[in-house]
Amino acid sequence: MSLEQVIKEIEQSQEIKKKEILENTKNILDKMEAEKKAKIDEIRALYQEKMRAESSRITASIIDKANIEARSILRNKIEEILEGYVSAAQEILRNIRNMPEYPALLNKMIEVAKKYLGQDCIIKVDSKDKAVAPSSGITYSNIDPYGGILASSRDGKVELDLRVSSIMEEVLEKIKVKIYTRLEE
């Protein structure tokens, strides 16, 4: 083999090696680029998922705060409305003694007390009702500004509070409980 052929073979061999090196380098770079893109996509997907989760958490927090505020506003409005009704009821109760039905109502309260606590029960009627209450077995004192009776069994173990203001408070409390229970549903 001549020197020229040897040089030519070496050059060809070098060209082949160069092509192989370039091909390998290109393959490595392509692989690195693909890995880089995959990693970027993975990071992007992870970031998007975190953003969705954070967005959902923030949205839920905002909705919860809005619900709490709405309930508070609703409760305040209900309280305001109830106060209006209570004021109106108190105005009516201030004049209940002047109503023609009051003597019958008072006598009915006394009948109920005697029925449930016994004929010998102790009944207290407000002093202002002395004129409309039967006098036998009745004690008079300042028990309620609106009227009604307080009764107890002879031994004092059982009491019956039929004062007008107590009845009104009890009814109002029951109404509030029902309203607030419905609000929580």
From Swiss-Prot:
Molecular function GO labels: ATP binding; proton-transporting ATP synthase activity, rotational mechanism; proton-transporting ATPase activity, rotational mechanism
Coiled coil feature spans: none
Membrane topology of this protein: Peripheral membrane protein
A biological process term (GO) from this entry: proton motive force-driven plasma membrane ATP synthesis
Subcellular location per the Swiss-Prot or TrEMBL entry: Cell membrane
Example of a GO cellular component annotation carried by this entry: plasma membrane
Domain of life per record: Archaea
Alphabetical list of InterPro entries matching this protein: ATPase_E_C (IPR038495), ATPase_V1_Esu (IPR002842)
Primary localization class, coarse: membrane
Assigned keywords, A-Z: ATP synthesis, Cell membrane, Hydrogen ion transport, Ion transport, Membrane, Transport
Family indicated by similarity: Belongs to the V-ATPase E subunit family.
Subunit structure: Has multiple subunits with at least A(3), B(3), C, D, E, F, H, I and proteolipid K(x).
Function: Component of the A-type ATP synthase that produces ATP from ADP in the presence of a proton gradient across the membrane.
Protein name in UniProt: A-type ATP synthase subunit E
Species annotation: Thermoplasma volcanium (strain ATCC 51530 / DSM 4299 / JCM 9571 / NBRC 15438 / GSS1)
Gene: atpE
